[in-house]
Amino acid sequence: GQAYPGANVSFRINPGTGSGSNRKTNVGGPSASFGIWHTQADQVAEIAAKHKLNITRIHSHIGSGSDPEVWKAVAEMTLAQADKFPAVHTVNLGGGFKVARMSSEKSTDLQEVGEFVKQVFVAHAAKTGNEYKLEIEPGTYLSANCGSLLCDVDDITNTGDDGYTFLKLNTGMDTITRPALYASEHPIVILNDNTETTNYVVCGHCCESGDMFTVDENDNLTTRELNTANIGALVVIEGAGAYCASMSLKNYNSFPTTPQLLLDSGEFKVIQQPQALKDMLAVEIIPELS
């Protein structure tokens, strides 16, 4: 306000509820720090008035869930907050449209959720006379299943008859962090013609016991029935088009970032070059020590 008096601004509100498969993907409600708590909106109005700021947009984001009732409730609550600011013309309900990467998961039905939200906006306009432009952010919904990670089997080990058989890959949480961070699952395919299968715990190459690709929603180890593999077998990890390369633990354990290719009309085009060791070391400075 002091730097840009009179500017048009937007603010994010925490509507008091959220949605997600676990705490780490739920970004609304009392346990989430994002946004201004919904009962504190009056303070926003006071600050805006003090600095002659125009609140023209209001934003909320609840996490990654697919329950249309939650979206309906959040839309109603966000519209009620928007009514407090006469200059608001746009309501952004954020993203978080759940995408099923695994066959056991349920994607958000955009038609169902959209109909619920539409009814809320139409009813609100009829009741209050206030019409708002609706914005959403469906980035993950559009891109999650548009990418795959290719890797190899580095090693196969086991912990005895009462333990597990581990399929160790030459990739890990440094490239796909979602399983380690969110206990998320990705489809995994062994590219061979083997008709026999084995129950594997699939793990990454980082020096972390949490670098696992096969865990349940509570982060417990699970096995995945896959084609029986040999060292060197090519592996495809699917569903890597969103929140994978963009939020990877780049250079963790000094592993280089993974090159990226774009498939355009049947032709592969490089969009991120392989990273050389000299590129990782280029940002490091060794000072003269006394």
Model segments located where?
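Catalytic alpha/beta core domains of metabolic enzymes, predominantly
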Residues: 93-94, 134
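C-terminal helical cap(s) of enzyme catalytic domains, especially alpha/beta-barrels
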Residues: 105-115, 254-259
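Short acidic, glycine/serine/threonine-rich loops at helix termini
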Residues: 1-3, 19-26, 69-71, 102-106, ...
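Charged (often Lys/Glu-rich) extended helix/loop segments that serve as interaction or gating elements
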Residues: 131-290
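Nucleotide-activated donor-binding/catalytic signature segment of Leloir-type glycosyltransferases, i.e.
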Residues: 128
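Active-site beta-loop-alpha junctions enriched in small/polar residues
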Residues: 12-18, 60-65, 94-102, 139-141, ...
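Active-site-proximal beta-alpha core segment in soluble small-molecule metabolic enzymes
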Residues: 1-90, 99, 111-112, 116, ...
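Electropositive, surface-exposed helix/loop patches at the edges of structured domains
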Residues: 6-9, 94-99, 279-289
